Amino acid sequence: MAVVIFLCCLLGGIAIGLPIAWSLLLCGAALMAYLDMFDVQIMAQTLVNGADSFSLLAIPFFVLAGEIMNAGGLSKRIVDLPMKLVGHKPGGLGYVGVIAAMIMASLSGSAVADTAAVAALLVPMMRSANYPINRSVGLIASGGIIAPIIPPSIPFIIFGVSSGLSISKLFMAGIAPGIMMGAALMLTWWWQAGRLNLPSQLKATPREIWQSLVSGIWALFLPVIIIGGFRSGLFTPTEAGAVAAFYALFVAVVIYRELTFSSLYHVLVNAAKTTSVVMFLVAAAQVSAWLITIAELPMMVSDLLQPLVDSPRLLFIVIMISIMVVGMVMDLTPTVLILTPVLLPLVKEANIAPIYFGVMFIINCSIGLITPPVGNVLNVISGVAKLKFDDAVRGVFPYVVVLMSLLVLFIFIPELIITPLKWIN
């Protein structure tokens, strides 16, 4: 009965237009009433406790770093370097989009921010060069969802807080699959570029490449500082967020001199708005997650899937299919916060590596960001590119097939994720 109440309130809230955070609070209130423990004070305290975590402090800092990058010229220079290196290839702007998305992923950790920044710079150029715009938009959207995989990743931070797993290990485990996803997308684009006879840009001279490298080196040095810092133990992933924000601010104001103090105000306001949305969503989801645990839903799911525990791979396939279905209709953050406490005990009981499960969870949910009917990243890039949502769906379809095929490969060959993690550690 608790499951029915939760789903009805969640889907009903979304259907009448409530934001997902308020829908989750509605679920929490309904579950408290069903469990005969409704108390506004307890609900408010649980809501506050949901956001009261030192690890979550990394989120506003990484959001701020991303805003500074966009306003301070770092994003522009990150796109310019791969443009000079591979832009002259047939369909070169597509390769630039994926490479830039991967570099941006190592700086912002947000799929929506990554996609919006790259699309704003490249889509007009692709349109001017007569690229098929729906395929181009699909490629950039697919590249944008690498952001939650390559560190620093806001979803990994949220998963780490929700599961109690090491955020540093989750960060390290995301590097290899993130690179593989980028390589798979570029290989797919190479095949399409050959069939579509896409035009190429003028080849940059060695001098232009050198100037672009010198100009962009300050921006490219940021992921080295972040990953190297917490990998060496110099600072924690949470402290890495503060370091990233300070470094981005220093480069934007002192080195590039493109961020003025008047524009800094707007950057801070935008970062505060984005952070408030994310943190309120996290807090609201924690209320529902707490009540789900009290209602013993994890135990019910465990009992339901108990016969599959002796077949870990079959169990994992069922779990991945379940996450995929939920990820297609719900945003990444609430999916992580709601399903993690339900599925993680079962994963541990089946002796599936929790870090591997965490990486697969986020990859699966990330693909959901570019699949209908919701597709948050598709909605964002459709707005930026002034393209109909249906056209964006058709454009992204071949890349979704490739990424899902890669997900299946990761399921049957977990060593593709686990072995590189051992090398890195």
Where are these regions (language model features)?
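Alpha-helical transmembrane segments of multi-pass membrane transport proteins
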Residues: 1-425
